[in-house]
């Protein structure tokens, strides 16, 4: 399509959140409003990998992945991590693994306390959670779950009657043996074991640009934005009036510009536009529009340890690769049944907080209902060099509420050069204590309980110099393993946070006519997996924008 010279609204970023936001906004404002989505990557629709589960693995590192590189990270043995993020229409919805998991009520309520705005509480967001999903499992509580939203959501057991993984019941029993009780999925309480929910529709991925109706929106792909243009009038805050593309073209916005470029690109674009830490911006010869020190700060992610376990008597057909699990039903989503969320015991948490110099618990982690670690068992090894022959399973032990914080800043004044990313993973005593505890709990479930020992033989060493972990392994053994091979779930967030960079209406502080709507707005981490929250936030953001227009029109 030809890029228009002027529109009402420009959305920078046609990713997971940007497409949902555009769709909601077009429906709220009607056909009289012109909305333009600018996406740096291509339209992936013709690529079959963009709609299949396995395709998500194939797309990692491809031309549809930003593949950001971090700086060497001292807290994890100076390793450089490649961060996957979708570089295409649909963004990371073309390559994520489909987990549909809200955070705990207490996670969102912590936001509310930080922001003094109940719209960001769990109950405040619940209408938008429900509005985004079509979850029609038998017996679903209509007060918690939506049934008519654009995103079809299924439980494992509800996706196909033939999709009955043989490890489902043994794992349920193993976790129960160590005191983990089953709780409803996505109903505001994470603590316990719940069935995994996913947004694969009969085995087909639902990228946001296909799940959401964009018929009332203009979309331009392969359109990288260089900066936001501002109008500066004496005694007034600068107003965002348009964008400059990397190829030199300019587009004006009559009403608002919304940045939805993700936790890396959104703060980078603000800094390129002169909004951010003045010292960083001026270093690259960019005029400072507004000194906002928090832009690019507060970076966090769900850091995790991934492991492989060897099964006992694999001829029983317990994981993928065995001929008994060849039915297409077993490939309709992630081969997993349960997610387990637990808290670090209070005495260990208190000790770690004190070690971090935070005895008053500024993160609010000691709330009785909060959980700190999520564990999953996947019936596929998912590891290089490990055969998919029915003999192995993979596991993830993931920090849900990390206290480690990183940052990012411009590497240059060019939009084509990625920013300098310093994640600072696993750098606090709390994060170390939580992950070590989570790994021990998993070892206990799989190698100590009777139900676990019946199916699992042992944890596998990931390579030379690293011994297998057992319940007898020391905390240092586990910590060394995490430092050696731990990696994030690519749930980056926090770099344009509500309360510091943004007000609670998602407006960029210090300027007019500019908002941010994506994972960078998270003021603090959430449990669960972010996409369920992001689709809700897109709906809320569209409501805020449309209400602002109505208020202005009324005046």
Which residue stretches match the model-derived regions?
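Glycine-rich loop(s) and the adjacent beta-strand/alpha-helix scaffold that form part
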Residues: 24-36, 41-46, 228-237, 242-334, ...
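N-terminal glycine-rich phosphate/pyrophosphate-binding loop and immediately adjacent elements
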Residues: 2-131, 289-294, 301-311, 329-330, ...
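A glycine-rich dinucleotide-binding beta-alpha-beta segment and adjacent secondary-structure elements
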Residues: 221-229, 236, 374-378, 390, ...
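A conserved FAD-binding loop/helix module that cradles the flavin
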Residues: 524-540
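C-terminal segments that line or cap access tunnels to active or ligand-binding sites in enzymes
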Residues: 380-383, 391-455
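Mid-to-C-terminal "cap/lid" subdomains and adjacent gly/pro-rich loops that border
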Residues: 32-33, 277-389, 400, 429, ...
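Conserved redox-cofactor binding core of oxidoreductases
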Residues: 113-231, 237-240, 306-310
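Internal hydrophobic alpha-helix adjacent to the cofactor/substrate pocket in enzyme cavities
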Residues: 285-286, 440-447, 538-551
């Amino acid at each position: 399509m030809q890029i228009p010279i002027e529109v009402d609204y420009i959305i920078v970023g046609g990713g997971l959140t940007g497409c949902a936001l555009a769709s909601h906004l077009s429906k709220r404002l009607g056909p009289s409003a012109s909305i333009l989505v600018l996406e740096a990557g291509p339209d992936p629709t013709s690529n079959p990998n963009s709609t299949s589960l396995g395709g998500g693995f194939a797309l990692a590192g491809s031309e549809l992945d930003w593949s950001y590189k971090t700086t060497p990270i001292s807290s994890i043995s100076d390793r450089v991590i490649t961060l996957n993020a979708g570089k295409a229409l649909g963004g990371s919805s073309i390559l994520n693994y489909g987990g549909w998991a809200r955070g705990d009520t207490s996670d969102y309520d912590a936001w509310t306390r930080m922001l003094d705005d109940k719209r960001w509480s769990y109950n405040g967001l619940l209408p938008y959670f429900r509005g985004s999903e079509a979850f029609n499992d038998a017996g679903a509580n209509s007060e918690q779950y939506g049934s008519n939203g654009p995103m079809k959501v299924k439980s494992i057991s509800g996706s196909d009657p033939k999709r009955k993984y043989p490890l489902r019941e043994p794992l349920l029993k193993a976790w129960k043996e160590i005191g983990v009780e089953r709780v409803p999925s996505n109903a505001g309480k994470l603590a316990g074991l719940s069935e995994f929910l996913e947004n694969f529709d009969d085995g087909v991925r639902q990228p946001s640009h296909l799940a959401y109706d964009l018929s009332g929106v203009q979309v331009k792909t392969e359109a990288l934005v260089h900066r936001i243009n501002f109008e500066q009038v004496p005694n007034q805050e600068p107003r965002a009036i348009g964008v400059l593309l990397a190829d030199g073209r300019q587009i004006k916005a009559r009403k608002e510009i919304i940045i939805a470029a993700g936790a890396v690109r959104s703060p980078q674009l603000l800094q390129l536009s002169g909004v951010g830490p003045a010292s960083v911006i001026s270093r690259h010869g960019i005029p400072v529009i507004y000194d906002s020190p928090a832009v690019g700060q507060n970076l966090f992610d769900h850091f995790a340890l991934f492991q492989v376990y060897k099964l006992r008597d694999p001829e029983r057909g317990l994981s993928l690769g065995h001929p008994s699990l060849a039915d297409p039903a077993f490939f309709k989503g992630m081969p997993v049944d349960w997610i387990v969320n637990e808290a670090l015991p209070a005495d260990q948490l208190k000790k770690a907080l004190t070690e971090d110099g935070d005895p008053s618990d500024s993160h609010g982690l000691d709330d009785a209902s909060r959980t700190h670690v999520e564990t999953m068992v996947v019936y596929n090894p998912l590891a290089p060099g490990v055969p998919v022959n029915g003999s192995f399973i993979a596991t993830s032990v993931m920090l849900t509420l990390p206290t480690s914080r990183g940052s990012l800043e411009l590497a240059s004044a060019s939009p084509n050069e990625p920013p300098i990313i310093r994640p600072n993973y696993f750098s606090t005593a709390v994060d170390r204590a939580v992950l070590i505890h989570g790994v021990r709990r998993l070892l206990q479930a799989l190698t100590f309980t009777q139900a676990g020992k019946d199916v699992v033989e042992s944890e596998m060493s990931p390579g030379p110099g690293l011994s297998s972990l057992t319940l007898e392994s020391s905390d240092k053994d586990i910590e060394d393993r995490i430092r050696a091979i731990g990696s994030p779930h690519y749930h980056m967030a926090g770099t344009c946070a509500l309360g510091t960079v943004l007000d609670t209406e998602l407006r960029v502080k210090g300027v007019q006519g500019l908002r941010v709507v994506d994972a960078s707005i998270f003021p603090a981490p959430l449990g669960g997996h972010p996409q369920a929250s992001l689709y809700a936030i897109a709906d809320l953001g569209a409501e805020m924008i449309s209400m602002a227009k109505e208020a202005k029109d009324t005046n």
